[in-house]
């Protein structure tokens, strides 16, 4: 018996599950377009699909925001139908032997900052910035980064009055500890600065292969978070970014200099990385590391030398939790590409398991319109091997509250509140030096820089 959602979407095979419910492949019976269908029981103790669907509706129209196609109740389930997307950056990171080149990181950084900025302009914080929550598109959108998983997103200001949420302390850690900002560890209410600091950790994770606070052992989750927090605060950004371009140091210094209600200068941050991209002599061709890996895999397969690249069946199964060595993660993730209970878990030998599935998705070279307003619908040249990678996070019911967090650092209202840099100096005695000198060159004066804002090939014009 065929199940049709909303009279329009045929429910296909199950491709994932998580704490939020179940994820299915679907197809629009009118257009044959493949979609992703999320199901959540109406009896769920902590329903979030309705909230997430509202966020999708509020964010519709932004580049890199999946298109919400339908939401409603079918029988005993809340159902959300959205775009079918490709692999996450965590999957691609594993596929590329857990290291990204500087070129790939800079191309990703530009798009990722744009995605965070867009959410902020719509009045929301993401609050769970991590590689799993950034996905690549499929087909004509294969070079476009999408941001997903709005389960922890929070409205930080009123769009009409622009009134900002109040400063608070003693907040539980919300998000993923590995990428959480220093202020989040200290129990401070999150604001725009924290999303950007988290993004900085993601970028360094891609460049370095790991972060200094990974793999710390502790008896309890609270002790684990405390160890991560301590290590993070005791690691100067100069050490974190050692042997990498100083622009990454400047990025962190800037993010940590922001006060609670400050509006970040997103253009400055993008310009840091764009100028570095040009100075390194890179071409904005959207050939990522995995694009080259995919081309090499295809070449080897054609010559019959594929033994080292072929992984197991593409069908998703849950990896046993026995080797889950990263308890700093507490968001449920659906991942049909990787056999794991939590992606980004540091299983360094597992990257080859992703190759055969990812190879089928990665085109040798694809350029798309990344910065034009995305249309209300997108076409796909459907392949039955395509999969969805959609995740859903919710705060843990057991999030630890540090009893020593109250009045960690006395603050006053308004602009006199300390920045993260000042907090670090007060808390650890670390010396920090400012490197916030802004480049004088205007992005609009350089034709190469302008290509970051509009690509020469529009996906919507391609047939």
Swiss-Prot record:
List where Polar residues composition bias occurs.
296-306, 376-396, 404-440
Where do the segments described as Disordered lie? 296-448
User: Where are the active-site residues found?
Assistant: 128
Q: What induces it?
A: Induced by 24-epi-brassinolide (24-eBL) and down-regulated by abscisic acid (ABA).
Task: Please name the top-level EC class of this enzyme.
Answer: transferase
Looking at the Swiss-Prot or TrEMBL record, what is one Pfam family this protein matches?
Pkinase
Which residues span the membrane? none
Q: How is its activity regulated?
A: Inhibited by N-(2-aminoethyl)-5-chloroisoquinoline-8-sulfonamide (CKI-7).
GO MF terms listed in the record are:
ATP binding; protein serine kinase activity; protein serine/threonine kinase activity
Q: What InterPro entries is this protein classified in?
A: CK1_Ser-Thr_kinase (IPR050235), Kinase-like_dom_sf (IPR011009), Prot_kinase_dom (IPR000719), Protein_kinase_ATP_BS (IPR017441), Ser/Thr_kinase_AS (IPR008271)
Chief localization:
cytoplasm
Give a brief account of the tissues where this protein occurs. Answer: Expressed in leaves, stems, panicles and seeds. Expressed in root tissues and lamina joints.
- Tell me what PTMs the record reports for this protein: Autophosphorylated.
Subunit arrangement?
Monomer.
Q: Where in the cell is it found?
A: Cytoplasm; Nucleus
What does the record give as the function of this protein?
A: Casein kinases are operationally defined by their preferential utilization of acidic proteins such as caseins as substrates. Can phosphorylate casein in vitro. Required for normal root development through modulation of cell elongation. Plants silencing CKI1 show abnormal root development, with reduced number of lateral and adventitious roots, and shortened primary roots as a result of reduced cell elongation. May be involved in abscisic acid (ABA) and brassinosteroid (BR) signaling pathways. Plays an important role in the adaptive growth and fitness under low temperature (LT) conditions.
Q: Which organism is it from?
A: Oryza sativa subsp. japonica
Tell me which residues make up the Protein kinase domain.
Answer: 9-278
Q: What is this protein called?
A: Casein kinase 1
